[in-house]
């Protein structure tokens, strides 16, 4: 996989997890 794609995917997962955590609390 492309390095840029990996970085974007990681950032996307981070943002989603952060949003889910904030909603849970």
Swiss-Prot record:
Q: Which GO terms describe its molecular function?
A: dioxygenase activity; metal ion binding
Question: Pathway it acts in?
Answer: Xenobiotic degradation; 2-(2,4-dichlorophenoxy)propanoate degradation
Q: Which keywords are on file for this protein? A: Aromatic hydrocarbons catabolism, Dioxygenase, Iron, Metal-binding, Oxidoreductase
* Induction entry: By chemostress caused by the herbicide 2,4-dichlorophenoxypropionic acid and its metabolites.
Entry's Gene Ontology BP terms: catabolic process
Q: What Enzyme Commission number does this protein have?
A: 1.13.11.-
Q: Give cofactor(s), names only.
A: Fe(3+)
Task: Give the record's cofactor note, including how many are bound.
Answer: Binds 1 Fe(3+) ion per subunit.
* Substrates-to-products reaction catalysed: 3,5-dichlorocatechol + O2 = (2E,4E)-2,4-dichloromuconate + 2 H(+)
User: Which family is this protein grouped under?
Assistant: Belongs to the intradiol ring-cleavage dioxygenase family.
| Protein's UniProt name | Chlorocatechol 1,2-dioxygenase 1
Instruction: Report the source organism.
Output: Delftia acidovorans
- Please name the gene that encodes this protein: tfdC
């Amino acid at each position: 996989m492309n390095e840029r794609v990996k970085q974007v995917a990681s950032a996307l997962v981070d943002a989603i997890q952060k949003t889910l955590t904030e909603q849970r609390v």
